[in-house]
Amino acid sequence: MQNKCPIFWINYIFNVTLHLEMKYNTYTLDNGLRIIHLPSDSKVVYCGYQINAGTRNEEPGEEGLAHFCEHVTFKGTERRKAWHILNCLESVGGDLNAYTNKEGTVYYSAILKEHIARAVDLLSDIVFHSVYPQAEIDKEVEVICDEIESYNDSPAELIYDEFENILFKGSPLGHNILGTAEQVRAFKRRMRCASQGSFTDQIMRYSSLMGILISKNW
């Protein structure tokens, strides 16, 4: 995948009335990481990283690699095992999730404001310090292949994919986000290299929706 940059952001705003004149605070750290903060008085806060590397950045033969990287990023870091990642926020009523689209990859959380430091620490850990254990990668291959099989059972999804393939013919934008089962199995050992090339400070943005300003030290 071509080198693109991560960004920390928030896209899920459920308990806040939106106005046309919302005041965002924006910062750029010395390392190039961009931070966006929307103040809120809500007891629930939202934060996440947006990495500007999605399926449009995949090279020929890499279709599905961005989505694969998203899955295995949750499978362990230098500090945490997979089970710790899954339970870190859930144990205090928080939510941790991710998704991949044509333009980028997003890792985000929703949590009570008193636990925001826990969410930021976990998100930063999985984005910057994932270790991609080969055993977990091998298991996740089958999970993704099952997801692809379910996707292929949906005529509506297949029609939409064909429409995009025609509309963006010759461009990565026309590719299916999941790729094929054959591709997923073929490039599983290349996943670590692809992730390290995509998760750089210059293409990353951090966003938050909370009542306290984010320190530049974050």
Where on the chain are the PLM-derived regions?
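Short, positively charged and aromatic/hydrophobic N-terminal segments
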Residues: 2, 7-18
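His/Glu-rich zincin catalytic helix
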Residues: 13-85, 193-218
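Charge-rich, well-structured scaffold segments of protease-associated domains
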Residues: 85-218
